[in-house]
Amino acid sequence: MKLYDSGVYLVNGTELVADDAQAAAAIKSRTGREVTKAGAAQGTIAYGILKDHNVSGNMDKLQIKFDKLTSHDITFVGIIQTARASGLEKFPIPYVLTNCHNSLCAVGGTINEDDHMFGLTCAKRYGGIYVPPHQAVIHQFAREMLAAGGKMILGSDSHTRYGALGTMAVGEGGPELVKQLLSKTYDIDMPGVVGVYLTGTPRKGVGPQDIALAIIGEVFERGYVKNKVMEFVGPGVSNMSVDYRIGVDVMTTETTCLSSIWRTDDAVKEFYEIHGREGDYKELNPAAVAYYDGMIEINLDEIKPMIAMPFHPSNTYTIEELNANLMDILDDCEKRAEVSFDGAVKLDLKSKVRNGRLYVDQGIIAGCAGGGFENICDAADILKGASIGPDEFTLSVYPASTPIYMELVKNGAVATLMETGAIVKTAFCGPCFGAGDTPANNAFSIRHSTRNFPNREGSKVQKGQVASVALMDARSIAATAANKGYLTAATDVDVDFSKPKYHFDSAIYANRVFDSKGVADPSVEIQFGPNIKDWPAMSALPENMVLKVVSEIHDPVTTTDELIPSGETSSFRSNPLGLAEFALSRKDPQYVGRAKEIQKAQKAVEEGTCPVEAVEELRPVMDAIRAAFPEKTFGEEMKPGTLGFGSTIFAVKPGDGSAREQAASCQKVLGGWANIANEYATKRYRSNLINWGMLPFVIPEGALPFQNLDYLFLPDIRKAVEEKQSEIIAYVVKGSELKEFKLGLGAMTDDEREIILKGCLINYYRG
């Protein structure tokens, strides 16, 4: 795999020309014409689709209107509640509500099914589409029923990726979907486009997860595709089936790219024909000369079976490399865990080595990444006639949709898997986010799913539990299962893959999915459960601000799972204040109490009482601020909005992973006004902060001018935002002294600044 250090021209879809002094002459000799870099940049597939959806008239500053929206049951309640509070009357474009996360209805009594009934009644009232539990995971339904060539889909899940079908899809936090529901736009600068040039053919036994992990391992740490579009081109694309391409595509999220798009061919056309939607196919190819801001060149022949060890999809090795350096790599994983868990629990992977081989406790093939038809058929072929054994090792398989499940029943794959001792379950995202198949304490699970962040498999550090997940392809998981849990690459087994043809039966959805066909019925009464709560009132940004640092995180990356846990906690997402009680609970259990304590001062301000009396700790802080800023009238007579109080956290690089808006909104409802970071892991997390009225501060790497529990004073912060200042002066209160330092605000649109000034997106739309 080669990552180019410069931009690259793709000529006639098959030749790469590096952007150097000889590039223009080389291109002219091949095409007979002169091209400019700016002109060639318009030759990417991504540029054409973005142009078709941009309503700003300026291709540097995009205002995108999407064709369709999709959400699942741990995001759609909050989104619709926000939209309702902002004036929603009907869904202006198709909006699909799937119920693939809290499908088991096993936590919190009625609250999960209450959310589902809320979704069904909203689909009826506002004109949406409702997919009941166990019918399909969000992204498989979108592939089967929503994707279309040249279109764009916005989803409230980070793995919203349908590029292999010719659809540019973006995963964002809920507020961005709210904007689309209110017929507003998705505003971004024109993203860079990085080409992924594929040649060769994947070797037998190598699956899409292997290709994806190989890419993630190369690009993540370098930030090579961060917030850019990945465009898959080259002859190697046609050497993969569409199901295979989908398996690679969905994992591009773990590179931190913004979106993805692939060139399309007759195989994609056949996919649409199989699904009864041949009219949605569109041939997509780059222009004769297309310019890319970067290029990843991959010979598919060279990719070997991969494994992403705990606790990140980028912690990748070939299985061959892992087996050759087993104890060293396991030791490294244990040391990383000690840092990540702050010594609260001890991960013991080396005890999994038996007779020089790594033993695995659990295998899972599931969800939008693993639950595809071909993944499961190939796994069944590898396992045919085998037994997974009567010991600790278990294997669970989750087809990504009921149509896939039914076809697997018809062709015998389900029977083959069940005969081995595997359990075949319904379409459910649980194993991907800690709501199903949580392993035993200190167990090691291998999964064809999307992520392996700390505790994402469901373990609870605060209760002394730890388990771990490695990501692998379904084929190597099956090979491991055939060896009763001893880690095995699929290339090490002798198998003939049957490659049965897929037949899609739309009758299942016709019988169970509610489709309003875009017709709203205002007479339908929305069904609310007792856990579904409105968003609490949120104040506008004050003129001046006192912030307490209530958590300080120095991990290289902080995931959204650490900011607000997934798993059973997700059941409470319909209740903003109830969910907030779990914020940072697995990373910093003292965060919630500290945030709520300083929030008392802000509540006192809003009630017209004295903040210092509410939080006695503030007395010397305010004395120091008054002494340093005597011109500021911070006395008992100060008018509302003059001074605000709240909390902030520091993290090196927060926001990797999920699109969940709750990673930000939970901080907000606990009184959070800001984050301070060296950088933000993803555009979507920074957008979530802004949409919830939180300041996304950045500070250079190095020694911090403050520490946890310090108070910070931000004079004239409202004026700084109004005047579009990119840098502000802040002060840390040290005893009776104030020490000055600087914070960056980064680029923001006028609308984003106005959202922060208003206090949140809801206030912004309420006017």
Residue ranges and their predicted role:
Residues 1-767:
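Fe-S-dependent hydro-lyases/dehydratases of central metabolism
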